Amino acid sequence: MRTILFIGIIICTILFDIQNKENDRFIFFLHNRFLETHELNELHPEFGRTEYKEIIWEFEKNGFEVISEKRNGNVNAREYAVGIVNQIDSLTKNGIDPNKITIVGTSKGGYIAQYVSTLANNPDLNFVFIASYRNNDIENIPEINYCGNILTIYEKSDPFGVSAIERKENSSCEIKNFKEIEINTGLRHGFLFKPLKEWIQPTIKWANGNYN
């Protein structure tokens, strides 16, 4: 199974074999900021190792085609999102239904996913934003406009993630399905470093089109 995927290469592989993948469901997974500037085995001083491969495996073993890569350097969230939107466009133009595509992001990856939602402007795409909304985001990042089927997940003890209902209410695009889940692991921002069932399971349900 793939764990570290280079997005351009894997998209080309998918498109080459597109006739056999029209019924597949796809997850674009966008990891947190720490992993941008640290190796896979490096430990965060408070939260430990980012279990990137293990997170991807959880999605793969549940039948998803996972598209992901370890970002290097402190990438610009909006610029990186443009590349993801182009890859999504390639999939949809080749017969993949938008409602079978889910963009999942943790922490900074969640902000990249929010830019994907804004730029793609497709109400049929699925999104899961994890620990990636703060109370001052409306003021500091006014250009983000939610669009799609949106699930937000945040941890009660995490200062970097709160309810994003204000962003939803300030977005102009049609949002057919919107749900928020507050979890309570006591792990603060460290909960997203691991494939905990508290956020993995609802993410999988959402990506399967179960919006209840």
What is each stretch, according to the model?
Residues 56-75:
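Conserved alpha/beta-hydrolase
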